[in-house]
From Swiss-Prot:
Its main location: cytoplasm. One of the proteins required for the normal export of preproteins out of the cell cytoplasm. It is a molecular chaperone that binds to a subset of precursor proteins, maintaining them in a translocation-competent state. It also specifically binds to its receptor SecA. Keywords: Chaperone, Cytoplasm, Protein transport, Translocation, Transport. Pfam families: SecB. It is found in: Cytoplasm. The keyword Transport applies. SUPFAM superfamilies: SecB-like (SSF54611). Homotetramer, a dimer of dimers. One homotetramer interacts with 1 SecA dimer. It comes from Bartonella bacilliformis (strain ATCC 35685 / KC583 / Herrer 020/F12,63). This is Protein-export protein SecB. InterPro entries: SecB, SecB-like_sf. Belongs to the SecB family.
């Protein structure tokens, strides 16, 4: 049994553990308040951009970061702009190398997303707007797009 926060490594079993989660950056801009807080006849246009980044940090640990930018505007004004960078450090050990990247870019963000969603909801509500609940994100498709983009960026080798 692991003691004192150590990771248990019995029998080379696969290990996937969340070591920590953290809020790295949060910005909420409400540039046209209080005018932006008035009732509206139609829903604002919401634009959401997300990026997943990951870097190894020490042996078998990965820092996975979700970056979101959420903008809401009506036809004339920006209503709000939220930028959030939220991360987690994950311990991944005794897992085949071919499974590491999907784990880091799909499962890790999937575990972080509910916290990101709650922070965005709280920020918009604290800014005077109804809470914005972001729909679930398909991290599999984002990962596939990332792989496709990386393959396009690789120079072709000619003999």
């Amino acid at each position: 049994m692991a003691q004192g926060g150590e990771i248990n490594n019995d029998n080379e079993k696969p290990i996937f553990a969340v070591l920590t989660q953290y809020l790295k950056d949060l910005s909420f801009e409400n540039p046209n308040a209080p005018r932006s807080l008035r009732p509206r006849e139609k829903s604002p246009k919401i634009d959401i951009n997300i990026n997943v980044d990951a870097n190894p940090v020490g042996d078998d640990n990965y820092d996975v970061v979700l970056s979101l930018s959420v903008k809401a505007d009506d036809d004339n004004d920006i209503l709000f702009h939220v930028e959030l960078v939220y991360g987690g450090v994950f311990h991944i050990q005794n897992i085949p190398q071919e499974h590491i990247m999907p784990l880091v870019f799909i499962e890790c963000p999937r575990l972080l997303f509910p916290f990101v969603r709650q922070i965005i909801s709280d920020a918009t509500q604290n800014g005077g707007f109804p809470p914005l609940w972001i729909d679930p994100i398909d991290f599999v498709t984002l990962f596939q797009r990332r792989i496709t983009a990386e393959q396009k960026d690789k120079p072709t080798q000619s003999s």
